């Protein structure tokens, strides 16, 4: 199967919820993918295929998953490509010494943290999460990775809300598996 064939089948499994979590957003729930072992495997296979095509000569040392939906498929994908998995968590959830950064989410600020010893200097990293919206949380993860001295190869997402232009805030190329909402509802 090609990446596009995987994407078509995965997209058909999504549930849609108009105006959730706020007016103008068509929420496309990708959780039904995890109810089917076959679809979950196709999600992993599609990302694995993309990474092999995008980085044929580069070893990916770590996948960095964002709390919390990046944790749903990030570890499985890391295992499939022979990479480590490192979580980015909200403040106060990781033991030991951490690096932290503050980012803006719509009308409030939040803090992300990573353990200082989680990624060695010079490591190659791919950031994984479910949806690219405003780019705030993914950009914050990128800031943490740079604080640790690693190189971000790419940000990968299941889906993107194109109209929010989140990819413009990110420090590396972006790959989105499924086509998401291109404009706000009602536009």
Swiss-Prot record:
Annotated localization: Cytoplasm; Nucleus
Residues holding AMP: 133-137
Coiled coil ranges: none
Enzyme class: transferase
The reaction(s) this protein catalyses: AMP + diphosphate = 5-phospho-alpha-D-ribose 1-diphosphate + adenine
GO molecular function annotations of the record: adenine binding; adenine phosphoribosyltransferase activity; AMP binding; metal ion binding
UniProt KW keywords: Cytoplasm, Glycosyltransferase, Magnesium, Metal-binding, Nucleus, Purine salvage, Transferase
Protein's job: Catalyzes a salvage reaction resulting in the formation of AMP, that is energically less costly than de novo synthesis.
Protein name: Adenine phosphoribosyltransferase
Protein source organism: Eremothecium gossypii (strain ATCC 10895 / CBS 109.51 / FGSC 9923 / NRRL Y-1056)
